[in-house]
Amino acid sequence: VKGYDMPVLMNAFGSYERMALALGVEKLDDVGDELREIMKLPYISLQHKMDVVSLIPMAKKAINFPKYVKKAPCQEVVEMEPDLDKIPILTCWPQDGGPFITLPLVFTKNPATGKRNVGMYRLQKYDKRTTGMHWHIHKNGADNFRDTKAAGGEKIEAAVAIGADPVLTYAATAPLPRDIDEMVFAGFLRHKSVEMV
């Protein structure tokens, strides 16, 4: 983008081949096949005489909790006076009201439970210091905001990540049940824990 020293990636998920590449699989069906395999795991009670040890390899593939680290690449540049004008934020659609950050990972948490949500909510740039969040009323991030307000808060604590691993983008947009953590799902897709700070 003219006038910026930061590259822009567009249409990263624009074909089946690009989606497979982003998810690290040969074919997109591989992801579904693996999920179906995990869903077939039997329920195990303490009274069940089944060989539990045989299930450990599959369980290790299925559950990769986030790994917390002290230092990460996202901490290498710290802007004390953030300026959105330094970032190439584009107006992509003819009817958009202005430039939007289109695929940000928006991290919020529920004030009562502390449960994390990672959603994909477009951010409209209003000026060099301000954005507006576009989330649908039925999304978990919106629930967290309503719960924050109900608890007496005026603002919700949020973090935004731009340019992350495409698996995180995919996980944040996946129609997961409310109790499934997007970062755990991303770990499942990547077959390793996602590093977080």
Regions found by a protein language model. Give the residues of each.
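Extended, highly charged
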Residues: V1-V197
